[in-house]
Amino acid sequence: MSVQRCNRIGWKHPGFTLIELLVVIAIIGILIALLLPAIQSAREAARRSQCTNNLKQIGIAMHNFHDAYKKFPTGGEGTNFKATPANTIFDMKDLHSTFTYILPFVEQKDIYDQININKTYRDTTAGPEHTSAFRRELAVYTCPSNPFLEYKDPAGFGRLDYYATVYTDIDPVTGHRNLATRVNGALAVPATGVASIADGTSNTIMIIEDVGRCAPGSGITFASYSKYHDPTTDLGGTLDPADQAVTDTGNPHSGTPPYRSVWRWADQDAGGSGVSGPSDACWDGRVINNNKTPYGGKAPDCTWDKNNIGLNDEPFSFHPGGCHALFSDGSVRFLSEQIKPQVMRLLVSRAEGKPLPEDFGF
């Protein structure tokens, strides 16, 4: 009997043609182009949510502080400006920032316990533990959307992306900066309580974003010392010689004493400031994210290294369209960068006595 053997027939699979390969590459490119914005949007949404949570935690801390001491912490920086009669001393500094005082209430009591509360953060006579406490980087005080988080403070102090709105210089008529129209915000020097916020806690901003001041060239230091508030007497005191005499060697933003660095959570001027807007020469119609574009500001006169320009001591964020604000009732809202300056004045002032427009929105 003959046996028939079946031979396997090998099938040849044809390869991709060049056209097919190009089509596949094009499809992959289209998918990536479609997915990348969605991924970036999801990441920003997560960062924005974390920023909101930071401010909520700060808000809870502020109210727990108020429960404990029957007043809010000081604004770090305050103002005793009066138009009538006019005076020339516009600023008063506490020994510490708002963010130093609330450390025990943001789960950082171990840091607070290292601090000599009667000495400023740059006073080296208070001992090494005092100085090292202020060098801690605290996630609750930084916005994750800050693109400059890789930059460290040259002197090693912890950074800050929020500040207390202690006053506003926005003119209620023109919407431009006008010192003669200054009014107090929710926090002050000396400290005040809920009762001082006559316009209502839900209508008055307490803390707002100012993100990115830690970037090289983004902020300036300036001789803003006038008088320290004496926490014992609740009166203006004298300058602390140790604080006045310090210059941070190697810090590109520092000059000669008594200059300070306005991006540290320990610094009174970083932790508290006004909402004023830029000078008329650099006015772009916004008090939130002013001069955000082009990146770095408009050269040569409206760049971010100038006071009150961009992220230098004004409301600013890298969230698209606006920034977060913590209100005095503990709520956090996102404010549009298109908000009218006059409305922003009403939101910052604590006792303006005027109603908010019903249609201004957030």
Locations of the language-model features?
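N-terminal single-pass transmembrane signal-anchor helix
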Residues: 13-47, 57
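N-terminal leader/signal peptides at the extreme start of proteins
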Residues: 1-18, 79-85
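Internal low-complexity, small-residue/proline-rich segments
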Residues: 41-362
